[in-house]
Each structure stands twice: as C-alpha cells, then as structure tokens.
C-alpha cells in the first residue's frame, strides 16, 4: 500500500494533478494493486508549478519542479520540498500500522533572486539556507475500505547554513484513497511553527531596509507561520498502477500565512497572506 501511495504522492509532489476521477463502475480496487512495487523501485517526475514569487507575495511565477522516490533494501529515499529525506524503518508485510523515521535535508531560497515587486526588491537580498533535521510519522491502513490510509507526520529542521539558529517544526495529517486500478487521490492539512531566528531572518524589516524601500521597520517574532490545505491526485497512463510506467497527476495547495509571516510589511502592505500553489507534471516508475 505504501508503494501505491508513494507513486501518487510523487506524481503530485512534482505537480501532476488532475481533477478527481470518478470511481469505476464496480467501485472495487484489487488487493494486489501495488504488486509492481514489491522489492526495489524508482519513481522520477518532472513538471511545472505556479507559485508565489516569495513567501507572502501576491505575484506568481511559473517554475520547473521535480521529484523522486526510491526503495532500496527496505530503505526509502525521497524528495522533500527542495531537498531529500529518508525512512529507515522497514514495513512489516501485511501490517495495518506502519512507522517512518529518518533524516531530512532541505534547501530554502526565499527572496534570494530577483523579486518582481518594485518595493520589496529594494530590500537586501537574503542568502539561501540549508536545513537539516528529522522526519517521522505513522500511518494506519484500511480505514473506511480496503486500501485507503490515514497518516500523521512531524518534521523538525534546523538551519545549518545561511541563517544559523533557525528552527522549523512542520506537522500534517493526510488521507489517501485509490479510486480504481489507475487512479488515486489524497488530501492533507498541516501547520508550520518557526522560532524567532527564522522569523527575524525572513520577515523583519531593518532600519536599513526601511530606508531603502520606504516600508516601515518591523521586528518579527517566532510562532505559527502558516496553515496549509492540499489536494493531490495521480493517474497511470496505461490504466494500471500495478505495472509501473508513465503517470500524470498534480497538486493544488492553499496556504494561509500566520503571525509574523502575515504581519510583515512585505506581506501585509505589498503581498497577500493567502498563498496558492498549483502544479502539473509527468512521472515514470522503474
């Protein structure tokens, strides 16, 4: 089951979304639907995303996106945002409850390049940051019917380059269900919490920045950064998720900025606390 979810989630994480497909006439999904993923596998995906120019911007840009997921000797390695994560806990065959735990590394490039907003672009550019931490979770399968699942995940990351001392805590709960031999959809709700160092780096406006841009000075504080709702789905192009091959899918995400992320003049005066992301793409399973 985790392998089926992995394929649809990977398709969606690189932007592969389609409208939710209707159930097949018989409404059933075979128990062996993930048989193509017994043993080792590799999923690669690439696509295009439509995302805010910076965190809090109301200007949007198209950008390339990509992702991967692999299973090697019961160890899973996967893309995590712009980064990589791993799960070192093997899944017991046939178990309804499954656990995940491993390291995660992420790259964050907020306001590091050219900014479209003519005022925010006058602020000093930020350096890209590297975040290192731990990710873990638990999932329960066969909730409402055979093959669906509910998962709870938590992640803690610390910045080790670009802005030392920052800490980010992310949690989410998700639900996934296959719709047929070829399609599956999922949804998730999540929140992020940041400490003062992280908030200050990304959302404060210094006296120097205020003089250059005309924005008021602002001192950011730690706390809740955002709440996020996400809908994703994937579809196998030959109509059978069991045999690998090509698939398409995508994701629609709505993020509501909170605390300093919403109150900073970069958001409150020049942007929007409502952040959308839409992505579409293509993936291949080996």
Regions found by a protein language model. Give the residues of each.
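Outer-membrane beta-barrel transmembrane domain signature
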Residues: 160-247, 254-262, 267, 284-286
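Short loop/turn motifs that connect adjacent beta-strands in outer-membrane beta-barrel proteins
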Residues: 23-40, 56, 75-99, 141-150, ...
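Residues on the lipid-exposed face of transmembrane beta-strands in outer-membrane beta-barrel proteins
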Residues: 46-50, 66-72, 84-90, 103, ...
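Flexible, solvent-exposed coil segments and beta strand-coil junctions
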Residues: 44-49, 69, 111-117, 148-155, ...
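Transmembrane beta-strand segments that form the barrel wall of outer-membrane beta-barrel proteins
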Residues: 44-52, 76-86, 117-121, 149-160
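Extracellular loop and loop/strand-boundary signature of outer-membrane beta-barrel proteins
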Residues: 52-54, 87-89, 118-123, 156-160, ...
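Cleavable N-terminal export/targeting peptides
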Residues: 1-38
């Amino acid at each position: 089951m985790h392998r089926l979810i992995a394929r649809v989630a990977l398709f969606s994480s690189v932007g592969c979304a389609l409208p939710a497909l209707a159930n097949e006439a018989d409404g059933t999904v075979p128990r062996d639907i993930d048989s193509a993923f017994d043993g080792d596998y590799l999923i690669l995906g690439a696509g295009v995303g439509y995302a805010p120019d910076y965190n809090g911007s109301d200007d949007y840009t198209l950008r390339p996106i990509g992702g991967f997921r692999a299973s090697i000797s019961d160890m899973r390695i996967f893309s995590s945002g712009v980064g990589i994560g791993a799960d070192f806990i093997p899944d017991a065959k046939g178990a309804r409850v499954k656990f995940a735990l491993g390291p995660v590394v992420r790259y964050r490039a907020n306001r590091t390049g050219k900014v479209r907003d003519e005022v925010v672009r006058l602020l000093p550019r930020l350096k890209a940051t590297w975040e290192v931490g731990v990710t873990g979770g638990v999932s329960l399968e066969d909730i409402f019917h055979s093959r669906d699942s509910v998962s709870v995940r938590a992640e803690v990351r610390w910045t080790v380059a670009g802005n030392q001392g920052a800490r980010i805590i992310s949690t989410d709960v998700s639900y996934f269900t296959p719709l047929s031999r070829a399609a599956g959809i999922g949804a998730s709700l999540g929140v992020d919490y940041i400490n003062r160092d992280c908030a200050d780096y990304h959302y404060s406006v210094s006296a120097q920045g205020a003089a250059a841009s005309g924005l008021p000075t602002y001192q950011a504080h730690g706390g809740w950064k955002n709440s996020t709702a996400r809908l994703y789905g994937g579809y196998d192009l030959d109509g059978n998720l069991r045999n690998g091959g090509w698939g398409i899918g995508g994701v629609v995400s709505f993020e509501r900025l909170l605390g300093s992320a919403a109150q900073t003049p970069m958001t409150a005066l020049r942007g929007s606390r409502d952040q959308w992301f839409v992505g579409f793409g293509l993936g291949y399973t080996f």
